[in-house]
Curated annotation (Swiss-Prot):
Catalyzed chemical reaction(s): Endohydrolysis of the N-glycosidic bond at one specific adenosine on the 28S rRNA
Name this polypeptide is given: Ribosome-inactivating protein luffacylin
Originating organism: Luffa aegyptiaca (Sponge gourd)
Keyword Hydrolase: yes
GO biological process, one term: negative regulation of translation
Enzyme Commission (EC) number: 3.2.2.22
Primary enzyme class: hydrolase
Keywords of this entry: Antimicrobial, Fungicide, Glycosidase, Hydrolase, Protein synthesis inhibitor, Toxin
Hydrolase among keywords: yes
Highest taxon above the source species: Eukaryota
Function: Has antifungal activity against F.oxysporum and M.arachidicola. Inhibits cell-free translation in rabbit reticulocyte lysate system. Has some N-glycosidase activity.
One Gene Ontology molecular-function label: toxin activity
Amino acid sequence: PRGSPRTEYEAARR
């Protein structure tokens, strides 16, 4: 499944 909101957030922020 998708990563945790933390990981997704950090990956999408940059």
